[in-house]
Amino acid sequence: MMKLNLFINANETESYIDIHAPKMNDHVQSIINAVNDLDKSHTLVGYIDKEIHIINVSDVITFQVINKNVTAITSNQKFKLKLRLYELEKQLPQHFIRISKSEIVNKYYIEKLLLEPNGLIRMYLKDAHYTYSSRRYLKSIKERLSI
């Protein structure tokens, strides 16, 4: 059981969080990730032709670079974004994982993984398609997915 203390002090100039724990573990790390995600963007602006759409980040399955444009792919739409992939990566919550130079995947949409003989990971996503990780990101992917 975790204990929570809240201290309201009018003399404080900004809000901050201190975490006290006997050791670092998955539970503590998930709290840190949740707090860090509070400052992250939860919506994005996407374009379909000349239409402007507000996209809920949690609906995005993957962000891919297609013909030099960053595209947000949901279960039923593809939206062009005006951000570069590296800019987007900084804004996204922790459950988005960079898997290659041209793709970021929402880990909540990963259905299963297949380790290929060549060292790549084939990721099957819930929208019935699959994608591949690059070797360069393999260590990071394994850490983020705890495999």
Swiss-Prot record:
PANTHER family: HTH LYTTR-TYPE DOMAIN-CONTAINING PROTEIN, TRANSCRIPTIONAL REGULATOR-RELATED. Residues 44-147 form the HTH LytTR-type domain. Keywords: Cytoplasm, DNA-binding, Transcription, Transcription regulation. Its main location: cytoplasm. It comes from the Bacteria. Pfam families: LytTR. This is Uncharacterized HTH-type transcriptional regulator SA2153. It is found in: Cytoplasm. The keyword Hydrolase does not apply. GO terms for cellular component: cytoplasm. It comes from Staphylococcus aureus (strain N315). GO terms for molecular function: DNA binding; phosphorelay response regulator activity. The keyword Transport does not apply. InterPro entries: LytR-like, LytTR_DNA-bd_dom.
